[in-house]
């Protein structure tokens, strides 16, 4: 799949990023991950991101990373395109990018470089080096220490033909508008704020109709119904789901840092697809939070 073909796929439909399965000892549980992917793939997501933020990319050892990407690619080969999360220091990100390409990933989601603060020019150099190390398509994730502006993104797009997408995890509307207007159809644009459904209508109005859904991990039918309601401007359905599910869900998610991942793993366990515990430094939901989430999920009905 060439970068432009991937760009076309990412320009419509719902995206998601499966949680990564760990066993009771905290090790990668391949069989559980295969079962999860086989369950989620038929629900109609346009693409899945393996080892993304919700997939606890930041906690995977190099050999585990390879195992996760290979498992996802092999399992979903005939059903849905797999993009691989890559990130961290430039040379580490390049190694991961080349490994993901070797294993058959259709594209990459370039997560932020690690801890170091850097100038716009430095971040742009980092992105360019990763893009030029592979032939597959790259989506850049503006989040945390990665905050590229429209000018530098435009320059990167000129120098890197395989830079095909921009995912926004900042929520800076002025920046999002400037990027969308400046780069036009050169990139595809993805909403990437945690629990993106809450922002989906606003982002669609900005020209960003596609987003990645975390709750697809445990209520895929509801997640697809919400996306279709957004696409159809069905404000009644959107409003009801936000009131009945997403706002109470956010109340649980916002209680502790890191719960954006923990709550998704809890949801997967509730619906019978236990992915095991989160890895430190994340912490799992407390029992009362788990029970509150279970009630919300039950109210959404069979998936």
Swiss-Prot record:
Coiled-coil portions: none
Record-listed E.C. numbers: 4.2.1.41
Pathway named in the protein's UniProt entry: Carbohydrate acid metabolism; D-glucarate degradation; 2,5-dioxopentanoate from D-glucarate: step 2/2
Keyword list, A-Z: Lyase
Pfam family, one: DHDPS
Phosphoprotein listed as a keyword: no
Lyase keyword on record: yes
GO BP term (any one): D-glucarate catabolic process
GO molecular function, one term: 4-hydroxy-tetrahydrodipicolinate synthase activity
SUPFAM superfamilies recorded: Aldolase
Disulfide bonds: none
UniProt cross-references to Gene3D superfamilies, sorted A to Z: Aldolase class I
InterPro entries reported in the protein's UniProt record: Aldolase_TIM (IPR013785), DapA-like (IPR002220), Dehydro-deoxyglucarate_dehyd (IPR017655)
Reaction equations catalysed: 5-dehydro-4-deoxy-D-glucarate + H(+) = 2,5-dioxopentanoate + CO2 + H2O
Family from the record: Belongs to the DapA family.
Protein name: Probable 5-dehydro-4-deoxyglucarate dehydratase
């Amino acid at each position: 799949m060439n970068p432009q073909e991937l760009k076309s796929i990412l320009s419509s439909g719902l995206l998601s990023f499966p949680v990564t399965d760990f066993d009771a000892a905290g090790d990668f549980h391949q069989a559980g991950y295969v079962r999860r992917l086989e369950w989620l793939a038929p629900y109609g997501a346009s693409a899945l991101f393996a080892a993304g933020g919700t997939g606890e990319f930041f906690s995977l050892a190099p050999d585990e990373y390879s195992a996760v990407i290979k498992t996802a690619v092999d399992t979903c080969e005939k059903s849905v395109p797999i993009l691989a999360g890559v990130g961290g220091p430039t040379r580490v990100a390049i190694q991961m990018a080349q490994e993901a390409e070797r294993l058959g990933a259709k594209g990459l989601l370039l997560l932020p470089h690690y801890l170091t603060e850097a100038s716009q020019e430095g971040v742009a150099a980092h992105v360019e080096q990763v893009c030029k190390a592979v032939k597959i398509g790259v989506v850049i994730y503006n989040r945390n220490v990665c905050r590229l502006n429209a000018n530098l993104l435009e320059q990167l797009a000129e120098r890197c033909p395989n830079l095909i997408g921009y995912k926004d995890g900042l929520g800076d509307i002025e920046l999002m508008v400037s990027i969308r207007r400046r780069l036009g159809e050169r990139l595809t644009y993805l909403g990437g704020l945690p629990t993106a459904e809450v922002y989906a209508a606003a982002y669609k109005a900005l020209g960003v109709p596609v987003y990645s859904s975390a709750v697809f991990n445990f209520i895929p039918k509801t997640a697809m119904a919400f996306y279709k309601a957004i696409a159809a401007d069905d404000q009644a359905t959107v409003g009801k789901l936000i009131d009945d599910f997403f706002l109470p869900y956010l109340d649980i998610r916002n209680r502790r840092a890191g719960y954006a991942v923990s709550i998704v793993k809890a949801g997967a366990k509730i619906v019978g697809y236990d992915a095991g515990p989160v890895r430190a430094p994340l912490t799992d939901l407390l029992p009362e939070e788990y029970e509150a989430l279970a009630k919300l999920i039950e109210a959404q009905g069979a998936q």
